[in-house]
Regions:
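Structured alpha/beta or helical-core interaction and ligand-binding surfaces enriched in interleaved
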Residues: 1-122
Length: 122
């Protein structure tokens, strides 16, 4: 699972050799520090892994951390919030992610026929 928060980007997986914990990885240490602090664990450096930083956390702790991250959403624009917490260089990378994901929009996403529109908003 890829997760973007106002403090960074992490990738969480459950390895077959350690099914009792989630291995949560990141490209930069700062992205993992809030989770490591909440879980009471140390960030492990693994320079030869696909992600250079990781923590091992119990599933319930990761779920609680995710819920806490969601409960802190008080902004109307994610990228602007990240510019405040991580700076503009990091935000530039988020724009690249946003642009890449724009390419995955399905063909009906910009449908203008009112009969085909959802009743919900945003």
């Amino acid at each position: 699972m890829w997760v973007f928060t106002s403090t960074g980007f992490v990738s969480a997986v459950r390895k077959t050799d350690r099914p009792d914990v989630y291995t949560v990885r990141s490209r930069d240490r700062l992205s993992l520090e809030p989770l490591a602090k909440a879980a009471g664990v140390e960030v492990i450096t693994s320079p030869f892994g696909d992600y250079p930083y990781r923590v091992l956390v119990e599933p319930t702790l990761f779920i609680e951390w995710l819920a806490d991250q969601a409960s802190q959403i008080e902004y109307s624009n994610f990228k602007n919030q990240v510019a405040k917490t991580r700076g503009y260089e990091y935000t530039h990378a988020l724009h690249d992610v946003w642009s890449a994901m724009l390419n995955t929009e399905d063909e009906l996403s910009r449908e203008t026929n009112p009969a085909n529109q959802s009743k919900g908003s945003n």
